[in-house]
Every structure is written in structure tokens, then in C-alpha cells.
Design a protein with these regions (language model features):
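A structural signal for isolated positions on well-ordered beta-strands in alpha/beta enzyme cores
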Residues: 36, 66-68, 128, 159
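Histidine/acidic residue-rich metal-binding segments in metalloenzymes
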Residues: 47-61, 77-159, 163-185
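Residue-level signal for well-ordered alpha-helical segments
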Residues: 4, 9-12, 26-29, 65-66, ...
Length: 185
């Protein structure tokens, strides 16, 4: 995340497109038929979004490239993330992303999950969130994601990944969490 933040100011659409097209072609040569990419929306220029939407069109005949509008610097933590995420969706990005554990507080993380799931539900989109990417057993945003999935009727349209905090959670809590995750689809 830190390195990406350092690179962002110097990025160009051409460089992003070139790298993405080379990767897509390499992936297809190895037998891959689908890729899901999380595209940072915290840069107000939306260079990566525009570049990857162009790449998506170019590779469409031979590769299913799904794009996730991803508030890399946090939905609430980054000043323009909400506005930029909505712009990215309006431009054609088809999946709502999130990174609740990167918010400043646990409460902001929970609120970001709700806000992002609400946006997805209102637009009929899928959700793909990086949740709880830490060793902290108290990082429990996957619980919020599972609950919001049920509340907003998003079953079957939500992916939670990078759930590394689960290995640190106590068995009692996990015994309640896993059934909730299963119920949420």
C-alpha cells in the first residue's frame, strides 16, 4: 500500500495499459480465462480506472477481466474515495470494493462495509472486500460484511478475502462467525 502510494503521482495511463495488457496476454498464454483486478479509486485522476476499462474492452474477445472499484486508501480515510468510487462505477467498473481494516477506527470500518454494500445493493452490483488483513483477532470486519450481505440481500454476490485475522480468533467466536458467513452465501 505504501509503495503504491509513492508510485501514484507518477503513473500514466499508457504505462498502466501497457503493463496490464502484457499481464493479460501472459495470463491467457498460461490458460487463464478470467481475472478480477482491484482498481484504486483514491487517485482523483482515476487514471488506473480509465486505463483498465480500456484494457477490459481490448481483451474482451479472449479474457473476462472483472474490475473492482477499490478505495485503496480507505473509504472514509481518503478524502475523495466515495466520490471517486461512484464515478468509477458510473464509468463502467462493475464491482464495489472495500478495505475496512484500513480505516482509522473499527467503527469507520464497519460503517464503510455498510455504505459500500448499500451502494452495491442500490446498483445491483457485486461486492469484493479485503477484510481483516492483519494478525489482530479483534479485526472482525468479515462479520460486518456477512451481516450486511444478509441485510442488503446480496447473497451470492459478495466475496471477502485476505481474512488473515481469522487464524488468531478464538474458537468460540469463530464457531458463531462461520455459520453466519455460510448463511450469507
Amino acid at each position: 500500500i505504501q509503495l503504491w502510494g509513492e508510485l501514484k503521482p507518477d503513473l500514466t495511463q499508457e504505462a498502466i495499459k501497457d503493463r496490464a495488457l502484457r499481464y493479460c496476454d501472459l495470463a491467457v498464454s498460461q490458460g487463464l480465462l478470467a481475472i478480477r483486478s482491484h482498481v484504486d479509486v483514491c487517485d482523483s485522476r482515476l487514471l488506473a480506472v480509465e486505463a483498465l476499462l480500456d484494457v477490459q474492452k481490448q481483451v474482451k474477445p479472449y479474457l473476462d477481466l472483472q474490475l473492482v472499484a477499490f478505495p485503496q486508501d480507505g473509504f472514509y480515510r481518503s478524502e475523495n474515495a466515495e466520490t471517486n468510487l461512484l464515478k468509477a462505477l458510473d464509468l463502467g467498473v462493475e464491482i464495489v470494493g472495500g478495505i475496512p481494516h484500513f480505516e482509522r477506527t473499527m467503527e469507520d470500518g464497519r460503517r464503510s462495509v455498510d455504505a459500500l454494500c448499500r451502494i452495491a445493493a442500490e446498483r445491483g452490483l457485486m461486492v469484493d472486500m479485503h477484510c481483516d488483513e492483519s494478525d489482530d483477532p479483534m479485526s472482525r470486519h468479515v462479520e460486518s460484511l456477512a451481516s450486511a450481505t444478509l441485510r442488503f440481500g446480496l447473497q451470492g454476490r459478495v466475496a471477502g478475502s485476505h481474512l488473515t485475522s481469522m487464524h488468531s480468533m478464538d474458537n468460540y467466536y469463530v464457531s458463531k462467525l462461520i455459520p453466519l458467513m455460510a448463511e450469507s452465501g
